[in-house]
Structures are given as structure tokens and as C-alpha cells.
Amino acid sequence: MAIPVIDFSKLDGKERAETMARIANGCEEWGFFQLVNHGIPVELLERVKKVSSECYKLREERFEGSKPVQLLDTLVKEGDGQRLDNVDWEDVFVLQDDNEWPSNPPDFEETMKEYREEIRKLAEKMMEVMDENLGFEKGCIKKAFSGDGQHPPFFGTKVSHYPPCPRLDLVKGLRAHTDAGGVILLFQDDQVGGLQMLKDGRWIDVQPLADAIVINTGDQIEVLSNGRYKSAWHRVLATSHGNRRSIASFYNPSLKATIAPAAGAATEEAAPPALYPKFLFGDYMDVYAKQKYEPKEPRFEAVRAI
């Protein structure tokens, strides 16, 4: 079993209807799919690989003294059979428009700004496809994420590396969770695997595919679609060989945006009852920060009570 791979270039051709249907299936049945021929230049993706790898090499010594490494060393020395269940074997930093970026390598900032602009455009195009498939007005999801245009949506890029791990039996690369926000676009390593998503009780590998962009839907897309699209559990397994690169961009609501099931296109049938509460996304994030690695349903109930 493998997650869907969709040729995004066919969206603008004779196979548009079939491509729209495949994306709908990816959102409804999987919550994960891979896009090829998505429009981001391969030359840019090659530069992103280069600068992110060079950046990690400059940070590698810092990771060797990090909390996960120290905790694992202590656990191995004590040898009491416990696992590291509260940390991830991951070196990570987040890029936003207004925060401090690494100054080295010298071309890191220019390259990543160019990439973020391209991946943001792809995210917004994907949201318009979701709008159409769900029967929403064009721009509905983006408008909801911006609080009816009052606040800019959040757009952050998480740059991660998963170094080789000496004890795979004791720690995960990234613990299982669903993503809190909207649409997530991942440019993952095309050599070193490890990403898995949960479907029908089975963990499925998200196979490395050169120059593809992995799309997954977050909790807020589940709410806006009133459960038609589900956020999927996923995790990253640590590996004993290779250094896995992972660049995930998150197109999320503003913390001030109010999220609730959206009204679909007008039909003769009565709208289904809302299965999710109406809430402020900032309140949801407060709950998520404490319950990220726990089932999502209690999070929805918690914000219902606020």
C-alpha cells in the first residue's frame, strides 16, 4: 500500500476532472499524498537541498550536545530498559518572515526566501482546489484562515534534520501526532526515508520521491470540511544510517482567526449538522501545545468548552 502520487500539472489540461478527483480522494481517504510536476523549479529544489545540508553541517556540533543526545547517553548508561518517550531525535529551526534566520551559508537566506514564496503559492493553489472539491466559494479556506481578511495567516517553514541514531529501540525521530493547522507541504529527503502515516490501523511508509512535495491536511482543514477531510497521524522513525532532511511549510490560520465548519455551495439538500465546535485558533493552539501527541478528539472538546 502506498500513498497517492498525483501529477499536479494535469490540473490545467484535459485531465483536470480526474486530477481533481484524485486530490479529493487523497484528502478524504488518506490525508496524505505526493505531488509531482507541481511547478516549483527543480533547480530551486536542488539549491534548497544544498543550503539546508550545509546549514546542518554548521549546526551538527550543537546537536551533539543537545538534550536528546544527553538523555539517550544517560539512558544507555543506566541500562534500565526505559525509552525516551518525551523527546524527538531531531535538529530543528523554524523560518518565518519576521524572525532571525541563519547567516551561514551565505546563500541560505536568499534561497529559502525564494523557496518559501514558491511553496506559499503552491499552498494557496492547493487550498483553492480543496475549496472547489468541497463546494466552497473560491478563497473560502484562505479567508477563514485570515479571520475574514482581518489578520494574515501564519506561514512557517520548519527545517529539520534527523541525524543517525545509535539506539533505534529507545527513541523516535519524531513522535506520532496530527498537525494542528491547515495545509502542510513537505519537501523531504529523497534518499533517507522514515516518514510514516497511519491508515486503517497500519503505518504506511511515505516513500522518498525525488523532487516531489508531500501534502498533508491538518486539524483545521478537518474542522472546515466538517470531517470530510481528516488530519492523519504521522511519525518519523529514527535511522541508524544517513542524515534525513525534512523541510515542512505550514499554512495555518492566524491565531486570531475563528474556525468552524464552513458552509458549502448552495444545494437543495439541507446542510449536515456541524460536527465540530466554533473556536479561536489561538485557543486551539494553547490546548495543542499540551496535548500534541495525544488523540485529537479531546482537543476539539476542550475548545468547545472555552
Swiss-Prot record:
Domain of life (superkingdom): Eukaryota
Disulfide bond residue pairs: none
Keywords annotated in UniProt: Ethylene biosynthesis, Fruit ripening, Iron, Metal-binding, Oxidoreductase, Vitamin C
Pathway it works in: Alkene biosynthesis; ethylene biosynthesis via S-adenosyl-L-methionine; ethylene from S-adenosyl-L-methionine: step 2/2
Catalytic activity: 1-aminocyclopropane-1-carboxylate + L-ascorbate + O2 = ethene + L-dehydroascorbate + hydrogen cyanide + CO2 + 2 H2O
InterPro entries xref list: DIOX_N, IPNS-like_FE2OG_OXY, IPNS-like_sf, Oxoglu/Fe-dep_dioxygenase_dom, Plant_2OG-oxidoreductases
GO annotation terms (biological process): ethylene biosynthetic process; fruit ripening
A Pfam short name: DIOX_N
Protein name, as recorded: 1-aminocyclopropane-1-carboxylate oxidase
Organism: Musa acuminata
